Amino acid sequence: MTRANRSKIKPRMEKTTDRKQADRKQIIFTEGAKGGGGKTTLLSSLADFFLAEKIPVKLVDADIDNKARGSLSHLFKGTPKIDIRTDHGLDQFIGMVLDDKAQTVLADLGAGSTKETWAWFEQMHESDSEEGVRFLAIGLVTNDSSTTSAILDWANALQDRVDYLVFNCTS
């Protein structure tokens, strides 16, 4: 029996041949229970990357309580500010996701509106997932222990209906 020399074996890359799978829209949104944890900063950095690389992206500022100069709609002119806690705002958001040509939607969700946001997700998820939309929830862990609890609460509420990306922002 001979052993293959692993250094000479090239990894086989699987290519997505299903265009429908490759063209699926995705909603990337922030999760968290409190403000000031860096969610908007992270999302704006991600938006900067997409725009610099000329990757089409739709930005949505759903953090209606953040009226300061640090909100997503202030940082990126033309970004709609939508209250997803209302039926009209929810319809507006779903319409934007499905009608916009951009494959990716970056949504900055408000802190402190966790239960309302979960209700929003419950209403939105079924109709959007039927359209093939994928979801990515971004959470940030800081030195504040409540950020860890918030991420676990979100995971408990959203379960396996989303993918998760958690950043460790502790020093």
Model-derived features: where do they sit?
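Conserved catalytic-core segment of NTP-binding enzymes
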Residues: G112-S171
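Extreme N-terminal, non-catalytic leader segments
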Residues: M1-F29, Q92-G95
